[in-house]
Regions:
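GIY-YIG nuclease catalytic motif and its immediate N-terminal context
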Residues: 1-36, 40-50, 60-67, 78-95
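A common structural junction motif
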Residues: 69-71
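Conserved donor-nucleotide binding/catalytic region of nucleotide-linked donor-dependent transferases
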Residues: 74
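Short, surface-exposed polybasic/aromatic micro-patch for ligand or macromolecular engagement
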Residues: 53
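C2H2-type zinc-finger recognition helix
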Residues: 56
Length: 95
């Protein structure tokens, strides 16, 4: 199973969006790895959103869609309006 996830840092007031097939391991690397690029700038990252996807391709396309929006408001609206997540899953269902 693939997961699209969004982390939030209050210190930076920034979101990080990614996807993975091993969520627990990926989160571990975000918090503990020496090779972190973006998430090393803060130590207060929290899980903001986690979406389960049907395939790797669906997860990649949803991640790309969210990043392309370049909007904190859009990401906040994913929580505020769960139907947006449903529509993304449907839009990229058979990709």
């Amino acid at each position: 199973m693939y997961v699209v996830y969004i982390l939030y840092s209050e210190k930076l007031n920034k979101f990080y969006t990614g996807f993975t097939s091993n969520f627990d391991l990926r989160l571990y690397f975000h918090f503990n790895s020496e090779n972190r690029k973006f998430t090393h700038n803060a130590s207060d990252w929290t899980l903001y959103l986690k979406m389960e996807c049907e395939s790797k391709n669906q997860a990649m396309l949803i991640e790309k869609h969210i990043k392309k929006m370049k909007s904190k408001i859009y990401i906040q609206n994913l929580i505020k309006y769960p139907e947006i997540i449903d529509s993304l899953c449907l839009k990229y269902k058979n990709c």
